[in-house]
Amino acid sequence: MTSSIECQNIFRSLQLLDLFIKIGVKNLILCPGSRSAPLAIAAGELYKYGILNVFNSIDERSAGFHSLGISTASGDISLVVTTSGSAVGNLLPAAVEADRSCKSIVFITADRPLRLKNCGSNQTVNQEAFLNSVCRSTLSTNLNGIHKNNDDDILKIVKMIKKQLLQSPGPIHLNIPFEKPLDISLKNKRKTLKVFETLYLNKTCKFLKQNEQNKSIHFSKRIFESLDLSNSGIIIVGPYQGSIKDLVSFNNSLEKIQSITGWPVFADPVSGVSADLRGLVENWELIIKKNNNVIKCNQILRLGPLSSSNNLEKFLSDFDGIQILVKENNRRKLDPIKKSLEYEFGLTNFVNQLLGTYSDDQKKKKPLINLVKVLRREGQKISKILNEQIFLNKEITEYKLANFVPKIWPENYPIMLSASSPIRDWLTFSENGTLTRKCFSFRGASGIDGTLSLALGIARITQPLLLVTGDLALIHDINGFLIENSIDLNLTVLLINNNGGNIFNNLYKNNLEKEELKKLFLMPKSINWENLAKAFQVPIKIVSDLNKLPESFEWSLSMQKSVIIKVDINVDNEMKERSLILKKILNN
């Protein structure tokens, strides 16, 4: 093979991406640009070989979130490739969420060589530092250009990335300087591909595996001695942060700990907990709000981060007993109330270590403790009120959707809840309806950013998918529909149109004038959603009767592509009804 720069640029790009494939990468999101041309050409060839899925996105911000959705739903590392300059800055929102959600993405950014840095060269910035604050590692190939790297250099980089992501899943930034020429002649490309196919394409490489990583799992005597599983306690399961590939093991371990304790389980809608787990309590968030005095115990086992519930946070803050917090894939502090002992090696390791200290007799299944029966009675009272009130009229409200939708969307089909109101409403009103399926929400940074692109990424892996979102969250990321073939993915968007950020009505309405509230917080846009959907070639249906939702879902599933079901919310009626039903529950 010729050693010309153009050949080396392509060859090293092929080698790099092929090594990523060998560590499990299946999907790459490609953004437009010239400096990244060698990576784009290499990705195109690997796509032709049938070993890499490549999807293009003209918006780097959407691309980052789309890749995050793919990584979350698959459990695999995903790649994003961009050109230089501000393109890299647009990756930051997705990198922030990937960091906090502990999901593995490698952002590969093309750059100018060192000779063009800090001298005013066009589109040349300190992009290598843009993502530093949120990435697990920031790496670079040779600063003078990737053509200066050898085989071992490229292999070493990929091995470092694999090891880092096994130890601490999250985003990694790989910055790659390219010297011109960035294109390659057809003749030289054929020569380069022949060498690559002969020497590298089918070459096997040994990489660190999950069970081989040198990860020190400590036995915390203080934590295990603090728990007394023979006495009453509660298991509270927050949003699941582990890999979806580990979810079965997580649920098996949860089943073991519940079995030997008989404790009640409070499960977040996106906890990943199986619906058939013994000890589950419905309406637990409302029970805490109504009367947490019925919860008589002195220890709590918390799994994962805190749910989006002020009632739960207050309950835990006031709780005087022992709190143990078990984390998945997350070594940072996760307890904002600062009252727990934290264990960072995951529930499976926690249970294995704990049971290793128990006798066979102690490991036997125990009946449900009396507290479960008490809490379930309270939950049933609340369910009775909800079932009575929800169909008193046909008007659609947000809390009705949270209760009704998980009952009518097919129970084995996944759901994604956008941040802001939906995740909070479903926590309060869904009656554990999400636990029959995979349910996703991105709570790492708790923003509405990237909602549609995330959902489309999930839908590439697991579909049909239902996205439940407010209007501002959807319009904020409407560019997601520009990602390659995204409108052909089987995604139903349930658009809750309240013409603004309705969550702020609950927070600030009492102390602001109506117009002031609109301008400063609600920010209504009065979008013509029918015209907007048409512009993106996405079918849309408008539903105003709650009883018509089941047939609307039948329609959306029959379309087998991206569609929008829009429901308009009368905000004033919503708030009145919500207030009345909560009052009835709390006073019952």
From Swiss-Prot:
InterPro entries: MenaQ_synth_MenD, THDP-binding, Thiamin_PyroP_enz_TPP-bd_dom. Its cofactor is Mg(2+); Mn(2+); thiamine diphosphate. Pathway: Quinol/quinone metabolism; 1,4-dihydroxy-2-naphthoate biosynthesis; 1,4-dihydroxy-2-naphthoate from chorismate: step 2/7; Cofactor biosynthesis; phylloquinone biosynthesis. One of its GO terms (biological process) is menaquinone biosynthetic process. Its EC number is 2.2.1.9. It catalyses: isochorismate + 2-oxoglutarate + H(+) = 5-enolpyruvoyl-6-hydroxy-2-succinyl-cyclohex-3-ene-1-carboxylate + CO2. Binds 1 thiamine pyrophosphate per subunit. Keywords: Magnesium, Manganese, Metal-binding, Thiamine pyrophosphate, Transferase. Catalyzes the thiamine diphosphate-dependent decarboxylation of 2-oxoglutarate and the subsequent addition of the resulting succinic semialdehyde-thiamine pyrophosphate anion to isochorismate to yield 2-succinyl-5-enolpyruvyl-6-hydroxy-3-cyclohexene-1-carboxylate (SEPHCHC). Homodimer. Belongs to the TPP enzyme family. MenD subfamily. PANTHER family: 2-SUCCINYL-5-ENOLPYRUVYL-6-HYDROXY-3-CYCLOHEXENE-1-CARBOXYLATE SYNTHASE (PTHR42916), PROTEIN PHYLLO, CHLOROPLASTIC (PTHR42916:SF1). This is 2-succinyl-5-enolpyruvyl-6-hydroxy-3-cyclohexene-1-carboxylate synthase. It comes from Prochlorococcus marinus (strain MIT 9515). The lineage of its organism: Bacteria, Bacillati, Cyanobacteriota, Cyanophyceae, Synechococcales.
